[in-house]
Amino acid sequence: MPELPEVETIKRTLAPKILGKTIYRVEVYLPKIIKNVSVEEFTRRVVGKEIVALKRRGKYLLIDLSGKETVTVHLRMTGKLLILPKGSPKDKHTHAIFDLGDLELHFNDIRQFGGFSFEMPEIGPEPLEDEFTPEYLKTKLKASQKNLKAVLLDQKIIAGIGNIYADEILFEAGLSPKRIAASLSEDEAEELFKAIRKILALGIEYRGTSIRDYVDAENQQGSFQRLLKVYGKNGSLCVRCNNVLIRERHAGRSTHYCPHCQK
């Protein structure tokens, strides 16, 4: 699933290509990708509009159009936005094509969970922005009896963290995903804050993690997978303590960690 670093990378690769472009036509081949409005209403509200800004909020991509419309894109598990030359053939997983004149924006999604809407849910602060502070994190941790994995995945607490980066953040901080959030000391909460900032920034620097489906808008893979210490590495030896990494389910998700050095 594209998480904060992947969506940020997609935004950065899309922006130079589509800002200032007009949407001349939209073809929707799978109606369920249009959320909360009909395909006809969606088309009416976007066709003829200019793309004036591209933003990211958590795992969501926001496309601001002239006329004060904003299209919210959620890629979910396997969604992709690809910039292609005009007239490019669609494949069996292409569910929408936006005609931008000399270019096309294709939406592909193997699992068919992603889509477009005009709504944006309420989510927590951006972890790489000034609004996310150690004090904010400590307050949320102290108020929670959930385990740390669940807290990191809760989009209402912190926007944009998914399974891959949650595991890597907890390893960086030396904290067990099973730890109850309220049990963290001041120092441990500080280390978690630093780890969140560090791992997400590295994820963006390396243009995301390409393990299965993720590519950016130019169909290029990321390379953060080369830096993964625990995610997907159950049975391997911990790079920190040389003990065996394990995989368990926490917060309903596969969780990879070192039971020896993550406490």
Curated annotation (Swiss-Prot):
Checking Pfam families in the record gives:
Fapy_DNA_glyco (PF01149), H2TH (PF06831), zf-FPG_IleRS (PF06827)
User: What InterPro entries does this protein's entry cite?
Assistant: DNA_glyclase/AP_lyase_DNA-bd, DNA_glyclase_Znf_dom_DNA_BS, Formamido-pyr_DNA_Glyclase, FPG_cat, MutM-like_N-ter, Ribosomal_uS13-like_H2TH, Znf_DNA_glyclase/AP_lyase, Znf_FPG/IleRS
The residues that the entry says bind DNA are: H93, R111
Quote the record's cofactor note: Binds 1 zinc ion per subunit.
Q: SMART domains under this entry?
A: Fapy_DNA_glyco (SM00898), H2TH (SM01232)
Query: What GO annotations for molecular function exist for this entry?
Result: 8-oxo-7,8-dihydroguanine DNA N-glycosylase activity; class I DNA-(apurinic or apyrimidinic site) endonuclease activity; damaged DNA binding; zinc ion binding
**Where in the chain are the FPG-type zinc fingers?**
229-263
EC code(s) of this entry: 3.2.2.23, 4.2.99.18
**Cofactor list:** Zn(2+)
What keywords does the record list, in alphabetical order? DNA damage, DNA repair, DNA-binding, Glycosidase, Hydrolase, Lyase, Metal-binding, Multifunctional enzyme, Zinc, Zinc-finger
Active site positions: P2 (schiff-base intermediate with dna), E3 (proton donor), K59 (proton donor), R253 (proton donor)
Instruction: Extract one GO BP annotation from the record.
Output: base-excision repair
Q: Which catalytic reaction applies to this protein?
A: Hydrolysis of DNA containing ring-opened 7-methylguanine residues, releasing 2,6-diamino-4-hydroxy-5-(N-methyl)formamidopyrimidine; 2'-deoxyribonucleotide-(2'-deoxyribose 5'-phosphate)-2'-deoxyribonucleotide-DNA = a 3'-end 2'-deoxyribonucleotide-(2,3-dehydro-2,3-deoxyribose 5'-phosphate)-DNA + a 5'-end 5'-phospho-2'-deoxyribonucleoside-DNA + H(+)
Its quaternary structure? Monomer.
Any idea what job this protein has?
A: Involved in base excision repair of DNA damaged by oxidation or by mutagenic agents. Acts as a DNA glycosylase that recognizes and removes damaged bases. Has a preference for oxidized purines, such as 7,8-dihydro-8-oxoguanine (8-oxoG). Has AP (apurinic/apyrimidinic) lyase activity and introduces nicks in the DNA strand. Cleaves the DNA backbone by beta-delta elimination to generate a single-strand break at the site of the removed base with both 3'- and 5'-phosphates.
Protein family (similarity comment): Belongs to the FPG family.
What is the name of the protein in this document?
Formamidopyrimidine-DNA glycosylase
Name the species this protein comes from: Carboxydothermus hydrogenoformans (strain ATCC BAA-161 / DSM 6008 / Z-2901)
Write the gene name.
Answer: mutM
